Structure formats: C-alpha cells, structure tokens
Amino acid sequence: MLYEKFEYNINNLIGNFGLSKMSIAVSGGSDSVALLYLANIWAEKNNIELFVISVDHNLREQSKQETHYIQNISNSLNRKHYSLSFDHQNNFSNLQERAREGRYDLMTNLCLELDILVLLTAHHEDDYVENFCLRLERNSGIFGLSSSNINWYNNIHIIRPLYNIPKSELVEYLVSHNIKWFEDESNSSDKYRRNVIRQKLAKGADYIRHFSKPVYREEFKGDTERSTAAYTSVGEEALLRGPVKLTVSSRGLTTVKTIKSTNNFSIFNWIPWSSHGMTEVKLIHATMPREDASTGTASKLSLEAKCGKMSKAAIISQQLKTNKRIENEFKPELISAIAEAVKIFEYGFAFLDLVKFDKFSNEVKVQIINFLLIIISGQSRAARFYSVEPILKLITQDVNFKNTLHGCIIKRIQNELLIYREFGKKLPESKILLDKSVIWDNRFCITKNQETPNCFVTHLSLKDYKIIKKQLDLEPLKNLSCKNHNAVLLTLPIIKILEKVIAIPHISYYDNDMWNFEVSFSPNFVSRFTHFC
C-alpha cells in the first residue's frame, strides 16, 4: 500500500524530531497533490498542524487556477494555505534555476516567519533518476552524482518522503481516489533535456547518455581511488560510531568529542557565534555499515553507465551504490576535513590549513572549498568545478597568491588559505532595523537590545572609515586575520542613523554608551552533505 510506504519513509526521515507543525510545498501537479493527501493522513494520525504552501511563478496562464485549486483542497482538509508569488521581473535568462531558487527563498522565509522547521517536497523516485542522468552528462563527481532525501535550505529542513516511490504509483493513487490534478504542458516539451530523459524512461526505454567534454583534467582528477584513511584528529572510531561535537571560540575550532546522535541524517549544525564569549558547533553524521567502505567499488560507474546506456533499474542501482559510498567513506572524510583543517571566525572570514588539507581526497577538497565559499559569500549556490579547479592548482604550486571567486577574496599566506568576503560591484543591500533583529548580507544576524529610532544596517564606506578610524581598536582583528584587518573590516555590518556610524558591534565600537547591539555570523547555508544554522 502506498500510504504504508509513505508512512515508513517519513517516520524514518523525521525520527524523534518532536514536531507540532510542518509545511508542505504543493504546486497542483500529480506528485505534490498526492503528497498533500498522504501527508494530511499522517499529520492527523500524529496530531501535527500542516501548512500548505503554493508558489505562483507567473509564467503560465493556468498557474492561478492551480493555486485556487490547492486552496480549495486545503480548505476541504481544514489546512491553512499560503499563496506566494515569484517575480521574474521579465528576465528569462537561466529562468529554471532562478525560479527554483526564488521558490525556495519564498517558502523557507515563510517557514521562518511561522516558526516551522520542516518543509515536505514531492521529489519522487523518477526525479532522482532524472537528476542522476543529468549530472552524469555534466561529468559530476561522486558528490554530484549522489542524492539525499534530506536537505537544508535557509536553515529549514527539506524532507522528501517520496524518494523511493515512482510517479506511476502516485498517479494510480489519485485515480483510484478520484482526485484531480493539473498537468504542466512544459513537461512535454523537448526543449529541456530533463523532459527527453523523462519521456524515454516513462516508455520503458533505456537512457542514452549524451557525452560532453570531460570536466576533470589530467592535473586534477576527481573520484580518486584510495583506501580509507584513519581520521586522526577526530578518530576513526568516533566518526564511524557516531557524531562529534566541536567546541568553537573566536579563535576557531578547538576541541572534538563524540556526542549522542539525535536523528538518522547528516547535519553540520552551527549554533551562531555571539559577539561575546564562546559557543558550540555540532557536527553530526549518520552511522552506516562499514562494508565496502575500504574497497572503493561503490564509486566505480557500471559498464552500462560508462558506455552511456542504462535501464531505469540500472540507474537506481548505481545511485544507491553511489549514495552508499558517500555515506561510508566520503562524508566521514569531509567531516574530518572540516574538523581538522578549517577555522571559521565570527568576523565572517575563514582560514584553511593547507598542510592538513593536502592529505584529503580531491573530491573532498572540492567540497571543502565550496563549503567555505558558500559560507563566506552568503550565496546559496556552489561554484562550478571549472571555477574551483584553478584555485586547487594554485594551491599545489606552493606560492602565495590572491584571487577572487564566488564573491570572495582567496589569499594564500604561507601554509594557510584566507577566505573573506568581496563586495565587488554589487554592494550588500542596507537593512532597516525595524524589528528586534535582521539578517544582513545573508551572513550576519544583528539584534538590537534597545529601541533605536531610524537606524539601519549597512557596510563601512572608506569615507566613514576615515572619519572614525582613530577611535577603532582593530588589534584583535588584525592578529586574527594576519594583518588583513582593514579589508575584513569593510565587509562587517555597521549601524547608522542618517549619515552617522553609531556602532560596529564586531569590534565593540559605539559612539554612545546607550547603544547595545549583538551580532552573530549566521549565513544561509545550502548543502546535501553538511549544515549549520
């Protein structure tokens, strides 16, 4: 029975989360409508309040009909419905990616407003198969080819309980219960490669891979074959048997110890730094059987995949093997690499220990660089491999350098890599402090502890810096950043009233004793492998 399979999935994915409410993304298509009815049954059984969210992308005439239909279903199920609207601003370049990002921004921001931690989405087995094929054609490494049923976006837990259920079962469920849904006409267009793959697999035909030029060059190959190393800093036993806790101060990572697991999923949970004192980082990973962890066989694509012809069953099998190797080998290595080689500071910059970094596999090296670029830049998408590859090559040359990438300055200083924010031509938007707290530049959370009229958060301009520089104590920042304090200072949030700088909380600068602000480094991080919030 479909519901029993769904119930088993969602119970395993959520675990003992202690939820009283959750949200669900519903578009009007067969997948999400089926998910809505299944989730409604489960929510009733578990006494959970379910909030239904629809996003109108304003691209199709029938989209408003779909939203109205979902609202009617929600009302009939006695569930609250929220209709959101994506503004494409008549910009149709890279529209699919922008629409997806905009959709998740809208939905997760609403979840934060409603104090909801979990968002259900209707990604099903066929979606995972299509994604695998598309990533294979893009020459993705093993991390790119893997899939996850649990993701994080904007610190919201994205759960996909239909991951092992084919679309045909969802359609059959709707038909048998006389439930209507909408078909998106664009899904039948040959314009998109995904649709071509979908149509072939739906007819039971084999997937024929489109080969593109190799992304991995001879100088730097991903998915290297190697035996599993002992992770000395954290300890292999700790990584394989359970999660670890990292204690953090303003000087970076200091201690590591094993803690008890809370769920069956992997997260890198960063409780943001306060501008005063110390806090913790919880580094958690799911434990899985160690069989095959040291053989490396799971990472090898099947002969069918290499030849470019696979059945749907073969694709699913290859996906499972890939996922297993990620869980057994690469994810523990990634966790170990972050614990050993990375230091992230409350000022929004990071150092990477290149001596320790060098011992990890190339696939993990790419993930670490992207991990840092996303955190420091505040962006929600990772850099492409072809952009990261030159940095990795420079690192191997053992010479100091300074480059820009993905909204960051990357600077080698002897055996360390310093990464800090670069504004470039696109300066961060100023934010008015109307509420008690505000997120600025997708990185910092600023909280006011008193009523402050007409103040706003922005960055420090050179003009303002010249006016107040003699009043600033930059010695701590200077020491921590290896004398890059001036560059880092210009990336920090400041509070102004009209044209006057009244506070720079990071360096404890206040022009008046009455002001009191707190700041924490809390970027909107997106990952299938690690997370912090």
From Swiss-Prot:
Enzyme Commission numbers on file: 6.3.4.19
SUPFAM superfamilies: Adenine nucleotide alpha hydrolases-like
Membrane spanning residue stretches: none
Domain of life, per lineage: Bacteria
Keyword Acyltransferase assigned: no
Residues holding ATP: S27, G28, G29, S30, D31, S32
Annotated NCBIfam families: lysidine_TilS_N (TIGR02432), RPE1 (TIGR01045)
Family per record: Belongs to the tRNA(Ile)-lysidine synthase family.
Name under which the protein is recorded: tRNA(Ile)-lysidine synthase
Gene: tilS
